[in-house]
């Protein structure tokens, strides 16, 4: 019979952050593109496509930050140079901004969507916030890429 604690031990050792982190990047980008198309050609797409994608992006961003915190704790034990630790801290800060920004934006968007169902101004405002969130996600992804490809964080 399999021992459940061995399975949980294996899950804790597997680096999940690299696998999960790409979902919020892709979903925020897709939400921005689809919402922009919906504003440009309203009859082509449903108004809720970007909203649904933003919901999934928020969930995946929460998972990415939680797994990233686990990976940062592992990186702290390795003893990287100060420059690398500063970049890790900056990456964590941008990740937290993405998560909390996504949560607040999603709750606000859902509330205003149901309050003002057919207001084009809400859609334009949502597009502006999606663009801002996309920029922050891009900066966070860039710092994460620097950590991996330049500083070797998370590589064997």
Predicted regions and their residues:
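Polytopic transmembrane helical bundles with strong interfacial aromatic enrichment
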Residues: 4-156
């Amino acid at each position: 019979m399999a021992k459940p604690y061995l399975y949980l031990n294996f899950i804790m050792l597997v680096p999940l952050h690299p696998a999960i982190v790409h979902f919020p990047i892709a979903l925020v980008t897709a939400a921005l593109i689809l919402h922009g198309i919906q504003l440009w050609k309203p009859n082509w797409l449903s108004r809720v496509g970007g909203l649904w994608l933003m919901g999934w992006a928020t969930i995946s961003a929460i998972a990415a930050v939680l797994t990233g915190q686990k990976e940062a704790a592992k990186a702290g034990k390795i003893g990287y140079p100060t420059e690398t630790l500063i970049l890790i801290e900056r990456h964590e800060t941008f990740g937290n901004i993405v998560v909390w920004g996504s949560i607040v934006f999603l709750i606000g968007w859902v509330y205003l969507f149901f309050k003002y169902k057919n207001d084009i101004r809400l859609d334009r405002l949502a597009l502006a916030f999606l663009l801002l969130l996309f920029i922050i996600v891009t900066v966070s992804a860039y710092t994460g890429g620097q950590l991996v490809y330049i500083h070797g964080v998370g590589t064997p």
